[in-house]
A protein has these predicted regions:
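Active-site-adjacent beta-strand anchor residues
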Residues: 8, 93, 118
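Small/aliphatic-rich secondary-structure junction motif
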Residues: 3-57, 85, 90
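General small-molecule cofactor/ligand-binding pocket signal
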Residues: 36, 91-95, 146
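Absolute protein N-terminus
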Residues: 1-2, 149
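Gly/Ser-rich helix-loop-strand patches that form or flank binding pockets
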Residues: 101-149
């Protein structure tokens, strides 16, 4: 059913659940699993929820400096979890730009069968990686979109 799954991540609890659901699907269908983070202009501060992805010494930088590292750590954690669960074909993608449009464009370019994402992100101030864009992705995507609560 699914051969190519794209999962949008932002570090929120909904995105973590989406990653878990997508990992189960990828394992069940022996599908390619691609995790993506999309960055846009960072906020003035990094939320506590995202700080857990950073080492203490890294938290001394500005959000402009921290965002790429946060995204990298989110992707690394998701990739490790998927590989630990037995998914063989796992890839990570880090992009910047308009979040919903970038997710949809990558899904189309990668020929994703489904986009899996959390139903809610980190909110308007803190959601610089994914945010609350699931409704935009649903309206723009040509493939199936699964939102996870």
């Amino acid at each position: 059913m699914f051969k190519n799954i794209l999962v949008a991540l932002d570090g929120s609890k909904h995105a973590k659940r989406a990653a878990a659901v997508a990992t189960d699907l990828a394992q069940r269908y022996e599908a390619r699993l691609q995790f993506i983070t999309v960055t846009k202009k960072p906020p003035a501060r990094v939320s506590e929820e995202l700080q857990r992805y950073m080492e203490i010494e890294q938290l001394k930088g500005t959000p402009d400096q921290l965002v790429p590292d946060v995204a990298k750590n989110i992707l690394a954690e998701a990739e490790k979890h998927a590989r630990d669960k037995g998914v063989k074909d796992v890839r990570t993608i880090s992009k910047s730009g308009p979040v919903a449009r970038t997710i949809v464009d990558v899904a189309k370019r990668q020929k994703a069968d489904v986009i899996v994402m959390g139903s809610r992100g980190l909110g308007t101030v803190e959601g610089f990686l994914l945010g609350s864009v699931s409704h935009k992705v649903v309206s723009l995507a040509e493939c199936n979109v699964m939102t996870v609560r």
